[in-house]
Design a protein with these regions (language model features):
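A short SAM/SAH-binding and catalytic strip from SAM-dependent methyltransferases
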Residues: 121-134
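Acceptor-substrate binding/catalytic loop of class I
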Residues: 174-188, 226-227
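A short acidic, Gly/Pro-enriched loop at the edge of an enzyme's catalytic core
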Residues: 111-122
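A short glycine-rich, Lys/Arg-flanked "PGG" loop and its adjoining helix->strand segment in the class I
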Residues: 136-148
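Conserved class I S-adenosyl-L-methionine
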Residues: 1-50, 64-68, 151-180
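Class I SAM-dependent methyltransferase SAM/SAH-binding core
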Residues: 54-112
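Conserved Class I S-adenosyl-L-methionine
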Residues: 3-4, 28, 35, 62-64, ...
Length: 264
């Protein structure tokens, strides 16, 4: 089983607490070239939801979406934020407790959702469906708990996401590590969703990274589940990136991110 779908690895190591995710979020916040902001852009997609919407987020992580868009959350929305990791739920609670909107935090596996049929107006599953071992079961469960006019929002990455970084990692590792084949991407996600949702739309978010801090980029690589480099290989990366920074003033890395909207 791949680490990316190994529930024990995900809950006990990669996402035992928010450390690894915080490292990755920080680099996107600081060095993304699109000043509008990823979370603002995602939140724009919620504009058609009712004023009293009931919303289920699966794989909420640290709750960064709601933290970043706190001022935009309608007062009558009912949010249920779920994750399989106790550490992530604790981080989300700490980030959002001051909002005081009656947000529920619950430990839930997307393959077995403990809510009644037709409960929610919307489901959100951002950057997490490639962690699900049985996505068909998860899609069926999400569909079941959505109302007849409900919608699933699901963000993921495309084939070119962080391409240059993976190329550098591939080279210094002698081909041992590189870009991994995610099981739910911008290229293959629509077909998977259409088995359960008749209408699926994809929007892409234009962005890239211009990184000026080598230490943060090294920390990003260290945080990744799919990459295990030796200290010698890390030093090679650090040297190469430092040279690029001196020569070009920044390290350019492509981003390829987008959002599916799947309607009942």
């Amino acid at each position: 089983m791949s680490k990316l779908t190994d529930k024990e690895y995900l809950t006990q190591k990669q996402y035992k607490d928010s450390t690894n995710l915080d490292v990755r979020v920080a680099i996107h916040k600081r060095f993304s070239t699109n000043s509008y902001g990823w979370f603002n852009w995602v939140f724009d997609s919620f504009s058609a939801l009712p004023e009293n919407a009931t919303i289920l987020e699966i794989g909420c992580g640290t709750g960064e979406l709601w933290k970043e868009c706190e001022s935009r959350i309608p007062k009558n929305w009912a949010l249920t934020l779920t994750d399989i990791s106790d550490g992530m739920l604790d981080a989300a609670w700490r980030n959002l407790i001051r909002i005081h909107r009656g947000i529920k935090f619950e430990k839930v596996d997307s393959q077995s959702i403990p809510y009644a049929d037709k409960t929610f107006d919307a489901g959100i599953a951002n950057y997490m469906l490639y962690h699900v071992a049985d996505r068909k079961k998860a899609f069926a469960e999400i569909k079941r708990v959505l109302k007849d006019d409900g919608v699933l929002f699901s963000a993921t990455a495309g084939a070119n996401h962080l391409r240059e970084m993976y190329e550098w990692v591939f080279r210094v590792s002698g081909g041992r590590h590189g870009q991994i084949a995610l099981q739910f991407t911008l290229e293959n996600g629509k077909e998977q969703l259409q088995e359960f949702f008749p209408r699926v739309e994809l929007s892409r978010y234009p962005d890239s990274l211009q990184i000026t801090d080598v230490d943060m980029l090294i920390a990003y690589v260290r945080s990744m589940a799919s990459v295990e480099l030796s200290e010698e290989e890390i030093q090679k990366l650090e040297q190469e990136w430092s040279e690029i920074l001196v020569k070009d003033g920044a390290i350019h890395i492509s981003k390829d991110a987008g959002l599916f909207q799947a309607l009942q």
